[in-house]
A protein has these predicted regions:
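A short beta-sheet element
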Residues: 69-72, 81-146, 158
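IQ-motif-like calmodulin-binding regions
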Residues: 40-43, 87, 174
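Short beta-strand/turn micro-motifs at beta-sheet edges
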Residues: 13, 104, 151-155
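Non-catalytic DNA-recognition/assembly elements of restriction-modification systems
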Residues: 26-50
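Amphipathic alpha-helical segments with low aromatic content
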Residues: 1-35, 165, 174-213
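Short, solvent-exposed loop/turn positions at domain surfaces
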Residues: 74-80, 151, 173, 185
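A short glycine-rich beta-alpha junction/loop motif
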Residues: 110-117, 150-174
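DNA target-recognition patches
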Residues: 43-77
Length: 213
């Protein structure tokens, strides 16, 4: 929990707050001003299709991951004919849960449900950095405002609305990479900590089972 709090604080300080043009803290050596860009100038919607690649899922907590790692039934009998191709570095989001943060940068090649939107970089950028940027609370508020639907359960963010959203981003590609590398190390620590906790829980359960037969 403490590491998650540290990560949240880092995200707050390493990206500009709403209405500001520079973050509270920056890495040494970077002084170039950040710039405002519409997402449509950074990404284009990809509708490439395939049915013969690994199926990927998108969630609020895990981002993009192989569906085979999920506990949920992936409905193996369903047709994959219209599934969309995802390449490493693509940004993928669940159009109906975007306002909750169901978005991420993919570390995998694969395919996703046609219900998802695949945004492919149109320029050279660090998509991992944007994976963090696009999940910030300020961005989630923008998605909610730009989503269409009669209730939160039906709110959908179409690509044309996504493309029109403005972000404040580091223009320097190397600064993008340094930010994503730093936050990536924190994510690695969080994952290791969670695995240790799960191991300890399993050990405790095993001991209790043996003690009270």
């Amino acid at each position: 929990d403490k590491l998650c709090t540290v990560k949240k604080s880092m995200l707050d300080k390493m990206f500009p707050k709403l209405g500001e043009t520079e973050p509270e803290i920056r890495f040494e050596g970077f002084t170039d001003p950040w710039e405002q860009r519409k997402l449509g100038g950074l990404f284009f919607e990809s509708n490439e299709r395939s049915s013969s690649m690994e199926i990927l899922s998108v969630s609020v907590a895990k981002g993009i991951y192989p569906a085979s790692e999920s506990d949920r039934d992936t409905n193996p009998g369903a047709s994959l004919a219209n599934y969309k191709v995802v390449h490493k570095g693509d940004v993928v989001y669940n159009s109906m849960r975007m306002w909750q943060g169901a978005v991420g940068s993919s570390d995998y090649d694969g395919i996703v449900s046609p219900a998802y939107v695949v945004a492919r970089p149109a320029i050279e950028l660090d998509s991992t950095c944007f994976g963090y940027l696009l999940k910030r609370p300020e961005m989630l508020y923008k998605y909610l405002c730009d989503s269409q639907g009669n209730s939160k359960d039906t709110q959908t963010l179409k690509y044309n609305r996504f493309a029109d959203i403005e972000v404040t981003m580091p223009a320097n590609l190397e600064e993008q990479r340094v930010i994503s590398a730093c936050l990536g190390r924190v994510d690695t620590l969080i994952t290791l900590h969670q695995r240790k906790l799960e191991l300890l829980r399993n050990i405790k359960k095993s001991l209790l089972d043996r003690m009270f037969v």
